[in-house]
Structures are given as structure tokens and as C-alpha cells.
């Protein structure tokens, strides 16, 4: 069996990570995952490593080397237990934020990072909120006047998981330089120019190119969206196309302008106007 390679999909929320997984899944060389808990096994091992009193009393460098090799072999074993395919694309948005740790475990880790026009991300959240008036997920509190308007909900999401956390950590990767190791993919570019985007992905991964069918994308990842609450939506459309940007209609011009002002760094770096 050929040596297996693991790659990472660490995408912003509501930015097409599941779509990308299923496009990549057309390639018979690739095993693609739904939202994965593999990173939690690595981080769980790190908790044990840091809290272990015996390691602190012994040769700390030996324990450190052992921890990294433990994680490395554990990831290899995990991947080989899931598939015999040579390439494994694991999806979890926080991989990028642990790049320095990951790079001590996986040689030259390759991270695909999809981004999207920020008002569209927030609008996607708001639409999910409106679609579920029977559910109370804690977003809105009429007593405390929390989340009682679209603008307030956007402000709340900007300060909490998953959007606020992801944007804060993304900005940190740009600051500390780890982002230079990622391949950033704009969702809009994938929809409008998929052939070129996929070519750039294969070049970055150093894998042979593959001809994809963007009008017949089968759903190969399976996910229980109930686990993710009202915002869970991991069902893809089977043909790739760019839907009209409705963020102004959903959020209002004032909130769209506020998002763009607050995240100027994001728009400047990724070329959004």
C-alpha cells in the first residue's frame, strides 16, 4: 500500500467547507471526512502530556519527543483505520489555529482554508435563525435585550463561537505568519472559476490533477446536523453555482457597512470590497 498522506480543511464557518470536501471526494484517490474529531484526540493527548506528573519528574526532552511521536503514529493509525486510499482530507476549522503544534507532528502540513465575503457569512447565520422560530438556542434574550435584532445578533456572533472565534484566530495566523503555509480559497472563486481553483489546490497539495464534474456533485459526507443546533447545515447542492448575494436584503445596509468597517483587515487581505 502506498504511504498515506493527510491534508487538512480548516475553513471559516458558512464558507463552503462541506462543498469542497464533496468536490474532492469525486477523486477516487481521496478519502474526505465530515466535521472530524481527530484534532480532539491530538489535543486530548496534549492535555495528558501537560498534566502528567511523571513526565515532569523525568527527562522532559524525552517526554516531549515521545509526545510528538505518539501523536504522529496515532494520526497514522487513525487514518489507516478509516481508509486504504492514499490521501485523507480531514475537516475541522481549528486545524489552522494549531499549525505550530501540528507541524511538529505532521511534516509540512497542508491546510486548505476557505473564506467568504463576511456579510454573506453573517447573513447565512441570520437566515438559519429566522428559519427556526420554534427553537430557542439562547441567541435571543428579551429580558436582557440580547440578540433581539438582526444587528445585535451579528454583533453577538462576531464575539462568540463559531464566527468570532474563527475570525480572531485567523487574524492571529496572519500576524504570527503561520498563514503563509495555508492555501486560502475564496468561496466566490470556487463557485465562479472552479477549474482554476481546483488546479491550484492540487498544485499546493503536490498531487496529480483530477477532472471534476461540477454539475454532478454527489454528497459523500454524512453528518447529523441536529448535533450542531439550528445553524448546522452540511447538505450541499449537487451543482456548483454562485447564488446572488442577498446580504444587504437580509442584514440591511447599516449592518453590512458596520461589518466591513469592523473587519477592514479581512477585506484588505482577501480582496473583498
Which functions belong to the PLM regions below?
Residues 1-76, 82:
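PAPS-dependent sulfotransferase catalytic core
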Residues 91, 102-128:
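Conserved phosphate-donor/acceptor-positioning beta-strand/loop module used by diverse small-molecule
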Residues 71-101:
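Glycine-rich phosphate-binding loop used to anchor ATP phosphates in small-molecule kinases
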Residues 65-81, 123-204, 263-265:
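PAPS-dependent sulfotransferase catalytic domain
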Residues 1-7, 159, 167, 171-175, ...:
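PAPS-dependent sulfotransferases, especially Golgi type II membrane carbohydrate sulfotransferases
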Residues 16-30, 102-106, 184-209:
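PAPS/PAP-binding and catalytic site of the sulfotransferase fold
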Residues 10, 90-92, 115-116, 187:
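Short His-Asn-centered micro-motif
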Residues 18-21, 39-42, 96-98, 119-124, ...:
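Short catalytic/ligand-binding loop motif for oxyanion handling, primarily in non-cytosolic enzymes
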Amino acid at each position: 500500500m502506498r504511504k498515506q498522506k493527510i491534508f487538512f480543511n480548516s475553513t471559516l464557518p458558512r464558507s463552503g467547507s462541506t462543498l469542497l470536501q464533496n468536490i474532492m471526494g469525486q477523486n477516487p484517490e481521496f478519502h474526505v471526512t465530515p466535521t472530524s474529531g481527530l484534532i480532539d484526540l491530538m489535543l486530548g493527548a496534549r492535555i495528558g502530556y501537560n498534566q502528567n506528573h511523571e513526565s515532569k519528574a523525568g527527562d522532559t526532552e524525552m517526554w516531549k519527543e515521545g509526545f510528538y511521536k505518539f501523536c504522529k503514529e496515532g494520526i497514522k493509525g487513525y487514518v489507516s483505520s478509516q481508509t486504504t486510499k492514499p490521501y485523507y482530507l480531514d475537516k475541522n476549522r481549528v486545524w489552522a489555529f494549531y499549525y505550530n503544534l501540528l507541524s511538529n507532528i505532521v511534516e509540512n502540513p497542508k491546510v486548505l482554508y476557505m473564506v467568504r465575503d463576511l456579510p454573506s457569512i453573517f447573513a447565512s447565520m441570520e437566515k438559519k435563525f429566522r428559519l427556526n422560530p420554534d427553537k430557542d438556542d439562547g441567541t435571543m434574550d428579551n429580558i436582557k435585550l440580547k440578540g433581539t435584532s438582526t444587528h445585535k445578533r451579528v454583533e453577538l456572533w462576531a464575539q462568540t463561537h463559531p464566527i468570532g472565534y474563527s475570525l480572531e484566530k485567523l487574524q492571529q495566523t496572519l500576524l504570527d505568519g503561520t498563514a503563509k503555509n495555508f492555501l486560502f480559497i475564496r468561496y466566490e472563486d470556487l463557485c465562479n472559476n472552479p477549474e482554476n481553483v481546483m488546479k491550484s489546490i492540487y498544485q499546493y497539495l503536490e498531487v496529480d490533477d483530477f477532472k471534476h464534474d461540477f454539475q454532478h456533485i454527489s454528497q459523500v459526507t454524512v453528518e447529523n446536523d441536529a448535533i450542531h443546533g439550528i445553524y448546522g447545515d452540511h447538505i450541499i447542492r449537487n451543482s456548483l453555482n454562485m447564488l446572488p448575494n442577498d446580504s444587504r436584503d437580509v442584514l440591511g445596509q447599516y449592518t453590512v457597512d458596520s461589518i466591513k468597517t469592523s473587519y477592514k483587515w479581512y477585506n484588505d487581505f482577501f480582496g473583498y470590497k
